[in-house]
Amino acid sequence: MSMVHMNIMMAFAVSLVGLLMYRSHLMSSLLCLEGMMLSLFVMAALTILNSHFTLASMMPIILLVFAACEAALGLSLLVMVSNTYGTDYVQNLNLLQC
């Protein structure tokens, strides 16, 4: 395994640990999710380039589209929560309330 693959896996692991440690604020959780998605994108692109599998070349772009949709929904949720409650704590999100 090359050093580039190890760095990308380490970036994913650091983002995952950050998501598990700093899950009290919505903004930090969203940033960690973005780091995870970007490391998955780079890993998928490198894997497809190394394997010369041209049929799957659209997969990283589709992953990037879903990451952009996730970021837009996350930021709209952040704006809604901060306008409603005044903070961005994840504890304020309760699925039993409308």
Curated annotation (Swiss-Prot):
Keywords: Electron transport, Membrane, Mitochondrion, Mitochondrion inner membrane, NAD, Respiratory chain, Translocase, Transmembrane, Transmembrane helix, Transport, Ubiquinone
Regions that span the bilayer: 1-21, 29-49, 61-81
A GO CC term attached to the entry: respiratory chain complex I
Major subcellular site: mitochondrion
Gene Ontology biological-process annotations: ATP synthesis coupled electron transport
Function: Core subunit of the mitochondrial membrane respiratory chain NADH dehydrogenase (Complex I) which catalyzes electron transfer from NADH through the respiratory chain, using ubiquinone as an electron acceptor. Part of the enzyme membrane arm which is embedded in the lipid bilayer and involved in proton translocation.
Stated name of the protein: NADH-ubiquinone oxidoreductase chain 4L
Native source organism of the sequence: Bos mutus grunniens
Gene: MT-ND4L
